[in-house]
Amino acid sequence: MEQKPSTLDPLSEPEDTRWLDGKRKRKSSQCLVKSSMSGYIPSYLDKDEQCVVCGDKATGYHYRCITCAGCKGFFRRTIQKNLHPTYSCKYDGCCVIDKITRNQCQLCRFKKCISVGMAMDLVLYDSKRVAKRKLIEENRERRRKEEMIKSLQHRPNPSAEEWELIHVVTEAHRSTNAQGSHWKQKRKFLPEDIGQSPMASMPDGDKVDLEAFSEFTKIITPAITRVVDFAKKLPMFSELPCEDQIILLKGCCMEIMSLRAAVRYDPEGGTLTLSGEMAVKREQLKNGGLRVVSDAIFDLGKSLSAFNLDDTEVALLQAVLLMSSDRTGLICVEKIEKCQETYLLAFEHYINYRKHNIPHFWPKLLMKVTDLRMIRACHASRFLHMKVECPTELFPPLFLEV
């Protein structure tokens, strides 16, 4: 008995009908795209889905049909350049089109494209394609900005406890930061002739203007004292053993003093204001003994000027520098680490509250901690050279301690 083909058997239908009437499977894959050895495959395609024109591996939904990249390009070029009227067939338009024969007859290939449903009206000419791409890019940029604004709106602001901590840290900074917000009006400029004539030779070949060095050492003791006072006003710091307090202060003192100088960078005059009172130029600070450290602090000042930090942000950054659990010799490492995490979290939430316009503001600001660490390391190396050559009486005792 002859077996009739089942109507449910897709092989019993004509090839073109199967491609036209068959429903496309759309899988909810775990990732947005499927990758294979042959390249990019959109998530809505089956792994081995074939081009409805030639049977080659399909790459996507092109001009209303699932096709390969080759047939997509052939169809687009044919329409854009109006080539189809010039096509002809040697075999009365009866060629079978597959991935082997598709390049042998342009007319039959084009007829196959039309018969399976590829839409001529969807092909854009060059000017329209450029306009479409521009529109896509504009929409993408708009969505990116909207998502960024949305993410900023959903970032947490400080809690009530964090606001209390932020207030304490800010007041500690303001009460120990010389001249406060009036530093520009109260600063005094180091005379031009000081720091311009290097005199004493150093072991590494550099020279130091001892007059400039002497001026700097006059303000170093009160600057260190203010950093110590700042630390003592922080409740978490005062709860630590005295041994740990000393180690933390020695570790952060140069970092905090450098930060306080850097945020008082004046781009118009090209000066830094040290200890809130002495405005110096780059060359003066260099010749006064700091050399490469001078460049690092000035460069930090220039970069920080774009951040427009307020007193609270400077204060919290100082607290983060102070509570560094990686200082050598600490006893209560875990406690100090938790203290720093508390400051960091309050700091991050305050940054969210401030809503800065600089992209990636928070991670960029944290990178300044690394810069300040490098300044401290350079200063320590420089100080060893200076101790050898400069008279010991020029160094204040407290400066020698830290």
UniProtKB/Swiss-Prot annotation:
One GO molecular-function annotation for this sequence?
RNA polymerase II cis-regulatory region sequence-specific DNA binding
Which residue ranges does the record annotate as region Modulating? 1-50
Q: Which residues bind Zn(2+) 1?
A: 51, 54, 68, 71
Task: Sum up the protein's function in the record's words.
Answer: Nuclear hormone receptor that can act as a repressor or activator of transcription. High affinity receptor for thyroid hormones, including triiodothyronine and thyroxine.
Q: Which residues carry this modification: Phosphoserine?
A: 12, 28
Please give the superkingdom of this protein's source: Eukaryota
Q: Does this UniProt record's set of keywords contain Transferase? A: no
InterPro entries registered for this protein in UniProt: NHR-like_dom_sf, Nucl_hrmn_rcpt_lig-bd, Nuclear_hormone_rcpt_NR1, Nuclear_hrmn_rcpt, ThyrH_rcpt, Znf_hrmn_rcpt, Znf_NHR/GATA
Zinc finger annotations (NR C4-type) as residue ranges: 51-71, 89-113
Q: Which UniProt keywords apply?
A: DNA-binding, Metal-binding, Nucleus, Phosphoprotein, Receptor, Transcription, Transcription regulation, Zinc, Zinc-finger
Localization (cell)? Nucleus
Q: Which organism is it from?
A: Pygoscelis adeliae
Record-level GO cellular component terms: RNA polymerase II transcription regulator complex
Protein name in the entry:
Thyroid hormone receptor alpha
